């Protein structure tokens, strides 16, 4: 009976990744989570729920999560230190597609392993440090969009 319960539990209850609750602080962890689930105050997320008139960044490109994390020239300096840290932790990162890189920054690496990859905590710290350094979600930056 216990084997049956274990099999059902493994099938119906997804594995919880412990690194999702780690970060610089609760605020940065919340921002990171919002980016992961597509409900942040980026213009594309706000536009999708009619909270914004358009989905364009200040650089006139759609302000998506991948644009914010990997492309927007407004955050180039902050991004350089983020990518240096990520490439140090996970060297194959630079050879991944933009979609895969975005997934890694939002979710971590080696999620299919039973034993969590310890580098995910460091990846999350680096991403959250980037989010805070950009000040993209501060009230001052948000006022530029009004």
Which residues make up each language-model segment?
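Family-specific functional microsites
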Residues: 3, 19-146
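C-terminal functional segments of enzyme domains
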Residues: 1-16
